[in-house]
Amino acid sequence: MKLQYLVALLFVQAVPPVTAGYIHQYALAGSAIRQPIDQKTQREDLNKLVSDSPLLSLHRTICEIESVSNHEGAVGEMLIKYLRDHDFTVEKQIVPADRGTNSTAERFNIWAYPKGFPRPKIILTSHIDTVPPHIKYSLHAPDGDFDRAKVRIMGRGTVDAKASVAAQIIAALKHLKSNKDIPLGLLFVVSEEVGGSGMVHFSNSELNTNPPFFHTLIFGEPTDLTLVDGHKGNLRVTIHAKGVAAHSGYPWLGHSAISEILPILARMDELGDIPVETGGLPSSEKYGRTTVNIGTIKGGAADNVVPETASASISVRLAAGTPEEAEEVIRRAVNDVSGGSTNITVNFPDSMPYPPIDLDVDVEGFDISTVNYGTDIPKLEIHDEELEVKVKRYLYGPGTIFVAHGAEEGITVGDLEKAVEGYSKLIDAAVERDWPREVVVN
C-alpha cells in the first residue's frame, strides 16, 4: 500500500460523522472529504447568500422588523421607502387601531403603483402584520451536502406572510423591468391576523371603485406553492352560562354555571360530525366536514365555590351553507340541550362572518388545493355584479401553514425563490387575459 494512500485512509477514518455545518468539500486520494467550518464562517457564508439576492435581502429586512398586529408602522415605513426607491408611487391608507387595543402608534395600508398608473388592472396583495410573539430572524444550513435551495430561514413572519410580500414585490419589479407599462399594483394591509380591519378599510375606501378598475387580484398566503381553489367559511360563537354562587360544601344552595354549559359544549363539539338531517352542520365534497373548535373556556372563582358564570368561545369553519344557516343550527342545538334555559346566552360576535370562498384556478402549471384557514379575501367587496366578466381572484404563496404562527415558523430559500416564478406566471396570465371593457372611474 502506497504511503500517501495509507495516510489518506487514516485521515478519512479520523474524520467525525457528517453533521450540519459542513459546506465546503475537498478531494483527497480519490475520496470526497467534508471539511468542517466554524460557525462564524458558516454564518458569514449564509449572510452573504442572502445579501447577494434582492429577494432574500428584502425578505430578511422585513422579517427583522417586528410587526405584530396593531404595531405595523415600522415595517410599513421601510416598505414605502423601498418601493419609492424602485420608482413606485406609494400612498398611505391610515388605519385606526383595532377596537380593544391600547396602541396609539400610526399604522397603515400601503397602496403602490408604477408612476402614471394610479388605477392598475392587476393587484398583488398580502398582509404585513404577524401574530405574537416576535421571533428573531435566523438562517440555518441544511444537513449533509450543502444545497442552497435547502437553506432554511426561520423567524416570525418568514412564512405568514412576509414571504408572500417579498416574492410579490420582486415578481412585480421583474415584470416592470421588462415592460414598464404593465398595469401592476401592490396592496399590503394591516390586521389580517386579528379580524381584517386593514382590508375592510381598503374595501370601504374610494380606491375600491364601482365598477372595479382592476380585473385580477392575486392574494398572498402560505399555500405550499399550490393554487388554492377555495377555503372554508368562518363563524365565531360565544356561549355564556349564568349560575348562582354558593359554598361548595352545600352545592344545592347554588347553581353551577359550569355544569350548565358542559353538556352544551359536548353537543357543539360533535355538530360537524352529525348529519344535517339530524341537526348537524353541513359538509361538502370540496371542503369536507364543517369543523368546530372550542377555543377557550372560562368559569368559576375557586374550587370551593359553586361557579356563578361560565363562558366559551368557539370557531366554526364552514364547509357549506351560509353563516346564517349555521347560526340557526347552533341555536337549535343549544336550545335542545338546555331545554330553552334562560341561563344560557348564545352570541355571534363576528361582524363579518362568511361562507366558503371559491377562488379561480384557471392558470396552468400549478398543483391545486383547498385550505381550511381563513383569509381577508372575503373582507374585500368586489363590485362586479353587473359585469359580464367577473374579477379573477387567486390565492397562492410560499411556505406551509403547518408551521405558521408556531415557534418553528420557517421557509427554505428554494420555496421563496419558486414563489417569484409562481407569481410571475399568474401576472403573465393576467396580462394576456382579454379584458373586453374600458373602465371609466369618476
From Swiss-Prot:
Pfam annotation, one family: Peptidase_M20
Recorded superkingdom: Eukaryota
Binding-site residues for Zn(2+) 1, renumbered to this chain: D160, E193
List of catalytic residues: E192
Principal location class: secreted
Keyword terms, alphabetized: Glycoprotein, Hydrolase, Metal-binding, Protease, Secreted, Signal, Zinc
GO cellular component: extracellular region
Cofactor(s), by name: Zn(2+)
Glycosylation sites recorded in the entry for this protein: N102, N343
Signal peptide boundaries: 1-20
First-level EC class: hydrolase
Places the protein is found: Secreted
GO MF entries: metal ion binding; peptidase activity
Cofactor note: Binds 2 Zn(2+) ions per subunit.
E.C. numbers: 3.4.17.-
Gene Ontology BP term (one): proteolysis
Residue positions binding Zn(2+) 2: D160
Disulphide bonds in the chain: none
Gene3D superfamilies assigned to the protein according to its UniProt record, in alphabetical order: 3.30.70.360, Zn peptidases
Sequence similarity: Belongs to the peptidase M20A family.
Protein name as catalogued: Probable carboxypeptidase PAAG_00768
UniProt lineage: Eukaryota, Fungi, Dikarya, Ascomycota, Pezizomycotina
